Regions:
Chain A
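Interhelical loop and adjacent transmembrane-helix boundary motif
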Residues: 1-7, 168-208
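Transmembrane-helix boundary motif in ABC transporter permease subunits
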Residues: 19-49, 62, 77, 112-114, ...
Length: 227, 357
């Protein structure tokens, strides 16, 4: 593999790691809320969370680009107050990946919380634990495998993110060119099809590995649920 | 000031209406009633995990819930221990961590019960490193008891803690429970639909039926009235007599029940006292005068205190010092003129009696 290819691999892992870690607290909060909460308009929250699953990634990327551009409603604030530029940096790639992987992460986490017997939470409360203590000592530990599985799914999804990333972060060698973008770039070159093979193989291996681990964890989770 | 006072009213979407109020002043009270009578709802309201439309709950004078004044103490701050039918141990924690859960989350001032002593009394020493999934039903229930006690509750409530256990275990868990109450003097409210459990353990019983309290009093008295027994839901009244001085005699066991002699089939005399005998009301023969020349060993003298017709049969309550229920046909009841006050003899074959301990 060329040094450009290795750079793409490093960037991909960095972007995917940040995307999955950054989305995790929000996914846990929303997943728990969706699993336990009973409120009007729950369907709307669900719809918004799941939107990136059904929208063309390029459209999601377009919306993000509009919001995050230096003159966009969010981008202007970040640029003006914090001096942070998101678009066309690897941060932009991470953010786009995070949004794309978020529905998968929320779904896995929500299912994990739904599998926790709410009466165990009730038992914790009668033993003197408050709401937060109950969550951190009972609900979250019991859902931990589902949470990890969701994290891995989002990580794997980020490794493969293309459409939204290219809109928000562009395709800049050494800065935002992740594995999918590198494969795309190579494939567009006259003799590139052959040179893309190592990256393609590596990508397949990474994705399969992540999926296998996630599947394994979810199975152990279902064994863990008390009868 | 009573230990616990409760008044609650709630109308469910299904149309079921709960309207119960009572006060508790006893160490060991049983909340008794058939399934669906509202027992669990009452516990949930006291524990604070269910909030009814209208209620007030006071524990040792402290207001826990008062819907009229918008007061509602969270379950975490009520200091009420709750033991569930299926124990509900935390599956991801060892027995030791389960036991200490309540202790860690309760204020230090409430830690009145010594951990080592609980492990001792409930004989949990060998289980501490195990996970709940590797425990038997009885062991789980013991851990659940210990966990609740260690949270330093002012009131201990149990929702059918014995219902999922087999008969031989029930007696042993009840024993642990009584040992625990004796040791730490924690007032206990015990929910059950088993008359035998009520008779054996409770000092006071509150009887619920269809969301309302229909009787309360000492078990023998409260359960002797036909209305509370919810016969539509169970097989009728249960005969459970408290017996004393069980000794092995020639060819049988001899015992005393309310000052009269009782013959039991030969077996091992029970190790625990008091013990009980159980028999079916249909096995009791009622006679207006004592008869001789019968093989029947037990002749218990008493006075009819109640006659209750139920679906083609008549249940007669005879006070022999304790209540014996006899099931007779309407014709027999008429012929013998069985009415309250009538002096009768209850004839009982020794082999119809089952020793319960």
């Amino acid at each position: 593999m060329t040094s450009e290819a290795w750079t793409a691999v490093r960037l991909s892992l960095q972007v995917a790691m940040c995307a999955a870690l950054g989305g995790l607290p929000f996914a846990i909060a929303i997943g728990y809320w969706l699993a336990r909460g009973r409120f009007a308009g729950k369907w709307l929250v669900e719809a918004v969370v799941n939107l990136p699953l059904v929208l063309p990634p390029v459209v999601t990327g377009y919306v993000l680009l509009v919001l995050l551009a230096p003159r966009g409603p969010i981008g202007a604030v970040l640029q003006g107050w914090l001096g942070v530029k998101i678009v066309f940096t690897w941060w932009g790639a991470a953010l786009a990946s995070m949004v794309m992987g978020f529905p998968l992460m929320v779904r896995a986490i929500r299912l994990a919380f739904q599998a926790v017997d709410p009466r165990l939470e009730m038992a914790a409360r009668t033993l003197g634990a408050g709401g937060a203590a109950t969550f951190f000592t009972v609900s979250l530990p019991l859902a931990r495998r589902g949470v990890t599985a969701g994290w891995i799914l989002a990580f794997a999804r980020s490794l493969g993110e293309f459409g939204a990333t290219i809109m928000v972060a562009g395709n800049i060698e050494g800065q935002t060119r992740t594995i999918p973008l590198a494969v795309y770039t190579l494939a567009n070159q006259p003799d590139g099809m052959g040179r893309a093979w190592p990256l393609v193989a590596l990508s397949v291996a990474l994705s399969c590995g992540a999926l296998a681990i996630s599947e394994l964890l979810e199975r152990r989770q279902s064994l863990h649920v008390p009868a | 000031m009573s230990l616990l006072s409760l008044q609650c009213r709630h109308r469910y979407a299904s149309g079921f209406e709960l309207d119960v109020s009572f006060e508790l002043n006893h160490r060991f009270t049983s909340l008794f009633g058939p399934s669906g009578s509202g027992k669990t709802s009452v516990l949930s309201i006291i524990a604070g995990v269910f909030r009814p439309q209208q209620a007030s709950v006071r524990l040792n004078g402290r207001r826990l819930l008062d819907t009229a004044n918008g007061i509602c103490v969270t379950p975490a701050r009520r200091a009420i221990g709750l033991v569930f039918q299926d124990a509900l141990l935390f599956p991801h924690l060892t027995v030791e961590r389960n036991l200490q859960y309540g202790r860690r989350h309760r204020a230090a001032a409430r830690r009145t019960v010594a951990y080592a002593r609980v492990v001792d009394v409930l004989e949990l020493g060998g289980l501490l490193r195990r996970y709940p999934r590797n425990l038997s039903g009885g062991e789980r229930q013991r851990v659940a008891l210990g966990r609740a006690v260690l949270s330093g509750p002012e009131l201990l409530m149990m929702d059918e803690p014995l219902a999922s256990l087999d008969d031989s275990l029930k007696g042993r868990i009840l024993e642990y429970l009584q040992r625990m109450i004796a040791e730490w003097d924690i007032p206990t409210l015990f929910v059950t639909h088993s008359q035998a459990e009520v008779r054996r353990a409770a000092e006071w019983v509150v009887v619920l039926q269809q969301g309302r309290m229909v009787a309360e009093g000492p078990p023998d008295e409260a359960l002797a009235r036909p209305a509370p027994l919810a016969w539509g839901n169970s097989a009728g009244p249960v005969n459970l007599l408290r017996i004393e001085q069980v000794t092995a005699a020639e060819g049988h066991l001899a015992a005393r029940v309310a000052g009269q002699d009782l013959f039991l089939p030969l077996g091992k005399p029970p190790a625990v006292s008091p013990s009980f005998v159980q028999f079916r009301p249909a096995d009791v023969i009622v006679s207006r005068q004592d008869v001789s020349g019968l093989s029947v060993r037990n002749h218990l003298h008493g006075r009819v205190c109640q006659v209750a017709p139920v679906e083609g049969a008549i249940f007669v309550a005879v006070d022999i010092g304790q209540i014996v229920w006899a099931e007779v046909t309407p014709q027999a009841a008429a012929e013998l003129q069985l009415a309250p006050g009538a002096e009768v003899v209850c004839l009982l074959k020794a082999h119809c009696l089952t020793l319960v301990s």
